[in-house]
Amino acid sequence: MSEFHFKRLEKYKVGGTRDKMELKVPLPHSPSGKVYRWCPNVDCTPRLFLLGDAQIPEKLDISQLKRTPGTQGTTCPYCGMDADDDEFNYLGDIKAIQKYIEWAASRDVNDYFVKMAKDFNRSQPRGGLISIKMDIKPDYSQEPRAWREDLIRNLACNICGRKYGVYAIALFCPDCGGKNLHVHFEREIELILQQIDLAEQVAETNNSELSYRILGNAHEDVVTVFETYQKVFYRYMIKKIFPKDQSEKMIDKGAIGNRFQNLDRAKDLYKKLSLDPFSVLTLEELDLMKLNIEKRHVIGHNLSLADESYADTMSRGKPGTTVEILAEEISEFAETVKKIIMELEQLM
């Protein structure tokens, strides 16, 4: 079999000999061209993220880098763990590559013997008393293909330009390791502004009730984002600073609850970290935050009808009437929250 070649595998050969090849088989990729990565930290949640192409900008701010883009090493965007690239291999990808190699080798061997049989049969004399025929059943099995799905949140690091995908929110760029919390928040603002634009378009069709509901959803999203980003930051910092047995108690559902929907209760939690991210706000901005958080409660839990508590506390509206939701106020609210998110990122 000196003329035999593993034709399907040789195209992935990067070293070794013909009989003992070193292969580099590409990882399965998603429709957008990203590959699965899996955080090696067993305590990380949700662990799975996707890594795309590198697009290093012309002007690279090296002061923001943890690691030179494109070099050895990966950072988990969720928990911040740093490890070699191979440590982030997705087990399903390894199995998919093994399955492909087995299929390719089997097909190459089968193709060789099918050709050998054809050559042998053609070489046999015709018309004799005895005829010999070699019969090899061809292998028509399909090439195994692994399906990889893109996650909902796909963006690029604002520092090194690396594209990646996560579940809704992350803290770091997996390539350069730079802080990326504000990059995700910018995407949240984009989505909120799109809702505001949609509400204005609907209003032009004289469907004021639907327009009002869409604005209400946009307003609620700002508060939801405000709460969620604080939770993610807080859990990361607690795990970073405190021992595991202590941190697990400090970040469980009962210990956090909905405290990040209330500025005073959130401040009490931040005292455990000796931090006050709200210090970047003016008194007027703090009042704006409190107003909008109270308004969100009315929008989300009372069909936007002001109750006595809201009317008395905020000195706005009459009980039983709908609260006012304005596009410019939502935008101002989002920009105020952004100041807090930027401060959280600096404190990481």
Regions found by a protein language model. Give the residues of each.
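Cysteine-rich micro-motifs
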Residues: 65-82, 169-180
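Short Cys/His-rich "knuckle" micro-motifs
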Residues: 47-54, 83-91, 165-172, 183-187
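Flexible secondary-structure boundary motifs
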Residues: 135-137, 238-319
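Cys/His-coordinated zinc-binding microdomains
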Residues: 40-48, 80-83, 161, 177
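Flanking scaffold residues of small Cys/His-coordinated metal-binding clusters
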Residues: 31-39, 70-74, 149-152, 167-171
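Amphipathic, Lys/Arg-enriched alpha-helical patches that create a basic surface
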Residues: 293-298, 312-348
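A broadly conserved sequence feature marking short terminus-proximal activation segments
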Residues: 1-54, 92-150
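Charged alpha-helical initiation segments
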Residues: 140-217
